[in-house]
Amino acid sequence: MKSKLVLLVGFALLLSMTAFAQEYPKIEVPVGFSFVNVHPNQAVITSFNVFGGGGGFVYNFTPIFGIKADFMGYTQGSGVKLTENGQFLGNVSGNLFTYMFGPQIKKHSGKFQPFGEALFGAAHTNLDANICKLEGGCASGSGNNNGFAMEYGLGLDIPITKTIQFRPVEVDYLYTHFGSNHIAGASASQNNFKYVAGVNFTFGGK
């Protein structure tokens, strides 16, 4: 029994020494295009897309573990039409910004380098709306709101050179929680889908 335990401990130490002996970048800087399919949980707005992009910063502490900062911005400039039973009620347009931080796990070797992340932070939105009553008469307004943001997901990087990687896909579940002061009775929570594609720059290989 003791010999098996010693063997297991030795094998674990060998794996950890092998992992730490691998060369990996100390810093990553991803930038790219992104869109979010927003689900505001409203009867008149089931979902809509906002488009934008941004970047981030990753500091890798080990060959597989790093801490990531992620900053993204989105807009819906053309506006979302509001209808009920075929009747036009108005339109809504606005922006969304997210600022999140958290751990990233990534394989830093081979032709394909998958990664996963879990990020937490804040979101900011501003909204412009024109609302019309069914019996006639319209009103316009605007507002902004700050809330909690969280996302977790997976992605893939493909090395092109030692310092440039192509990121064809990153998909995330993005949760946001705002107050319901924009629309009376609105849900404070939104469950959204996020997609990112772009380039990842790596620096400081160990």
What annotation goes with each model-predicted range?
Residues 35-54, 145-146:
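Surface-exposed strand-loop-strand hairpins of Gram-negative outer-membrane beta-barrel proteins
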Residues 39-43, 83-91, 134-142, 180-187:
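Extracellular loop and loop/strand-boundary signature of outer-membrane beta-barrel proteins
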Residues 34-42, 75-83, 122-129, 174-183:
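Sequence/structural signature of outer-membrane beta-barrel proteins
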Residues 28, 56-137, 147-148, 158-160, ...:
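Gram-negative (and chloroplast) outer-membrane scaffold detector with strong preference
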Residues 23-37:
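Transmembrane beta-strand segments of Gram-negative outer membrane beta-barrel proteins
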Residues 1-24, 204-206:
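Cleavable N-terminal export/targeting peptides
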Residues 23, 47-50, 93-97, 142-149, ...:
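Short sequence motifs at beta-strands and strand-loop junctions characteristic
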Residues 47-49, 157-166, 171-181, 186-192:
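Subset of outer-membrane beta-barrel
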